[in-house]
Amino acid sequence: YDTAPGDLWEQERIHALKEEVEASGLHISGIESVNIHDAIKIGLPERDRYIENYIRTLENLGKEDIHMVCYNFMPVFDWTRTELARVRPDGSTVLAYSQKAIDALDPEKMFDSISGDSNGYVMPGWEPERMAKIKELFTLYRDVDEEKLFSNLKYFLEAIMPVCNRYDIRMAIHPDD
């Protein structure tokens, strides 16, 4: 979906998307992903404004009979892989992650490395406009350790769960988190 993290998903746009999908004979039963703004993950003072937009987005999804939202709470990137096409012994390819490779790269080199393997495909969380701010994001996340990130996730979930319960929305966190 083309709405920036933290921005409201308007009900009219959700409805139009749902109609377009259903006109093709399909049904939307869930959404991946209503992206979470970094201010929420970091715990910045402005996070409540973005949480309010998230709550209103959930209400709009619920009103459109969409009852599952997959999301992630990963810092900096939507997801991180160090290889997009690691060759397996049988010749197939898989995504791969190496902490050693992450530790050895600075953010710009990492972006260049991943982008070079992407064949021009822009991956979620790796958009060029986001990458222009990557050093700033790394600085903002510098003091967010595992405990702080989990505390911010708990704060977020406690804020959104009442509306999830009201609209029977199941929140499905990405398994990498």
Mark where each language-model region is.
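N-terminal pre-domain/capping segments
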Residues: 1-168, 172
